[in-house]
Design a protein with these regions (language model features):
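Bacterial Sec-dependent signal peptides at the C-terminal "C-region" and cleavage site
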Residues: 3, 7-22
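Short intrinsically disordered, low-complexity coil segments enriched in acidic
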Residues: 1-5, 216-217
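Secretory-pathway ectodomains
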Residues: 21-218
Length: 218
């Protein structure tokens, strides 16, 4: 069985005793039974955390204090490297927690698919700082989204599977803009040139998107 690993796997810079940076990848994926840190040089798993059968981990991130944040369909957890649970936020029955990421201000962004779908920002203690409910207009939660992101304007970018589009949603839940793309967009990340890199899921490609004009640059 071929597993689909998270396309936006985190690249960690870990300093060794001789102060030389070595590259590691934090990996997770729908259908895999663990999340793991892999040494890119040796190709060996240096740390892993088991996942229960049926958990769908589509987002995983390292926090500034080196803890591990991940979504698992039924919720999102923050754990230590010693596998101790710091907090666990559950998704409502019938919903799917698909996003768990670290924001630039040190807080965390969580999002679950549902009717309505919900985006939350929480702090390191798991306290909810803000909550945004919005209607994707997609009936099946599993067909909605995977990795929501936040742009520099403070709005949320939601890549939608079923409708093949990227939507910009305000913190109040208002739809501000929508851009159509190829495939089933999985993740969207800002580039230095202000465009966005979009992982297009089953289209098996990445695109560079100018979200303001809707043009696919490449």
């Amino acid at each position: 069985k071929i597993y689909t690993f998270i396309l936006s796997a985190c690249l960690l810079l870990v300093c060794s005793a001789c102060h030389e940076a070595s590259h590691h990848l934090l990996l997770g994926g729908s259908g895999w039974d663990k999340i793991a840190i892999v040494n890119k040089n040796t190709k060996e798993i240096e740390w892993e955390h088991p996942l229960e059968k049926g958990w769908e981990c589509n987002s995983v991130a390292v926090t500034p204090d080196r803890n591990i944040l991940f979504s698992y369909s039924k919720g999102a957890k923050l754990i230590t490297r010693d596998h101790e649970e710091v907090w666990n936020i559950s998704a409502p029955e019938g919903c799917e927690m698909q996003t768990a990421r670290v924001l630039s201000n040190g807080n965390y962004l969580l999002a679950w698919c549902g009717n309505p779908a919900t985006i939350m920002e929480v702090n390191a203690k798991g306290e909810i700082l803000s909550k945004t409910d919005f209607d994707t207009r997609i009936e099946q939660p599993h067909a909605q989204f995977r990795q929501v992101n936040k742009n520099k304007r403070g709005n949320y970018l939601v890549p939608l599977f079923a409708t093949s589009e990227i939507r910009e949603i305000s913190p109040s839940g208002q739809l501000l803009k929508s851009v159509k793309v190829d495939g089933n967009p999985f993740s969207v990340a800002a580039l230095d040139n202000c465009n966005y890199l979009v992982a297009c899921g089953d289209a098996h490609c990445f695109i560079e998107l100018n979200f303001e004009t809707g043009d696919i640059v490449r």
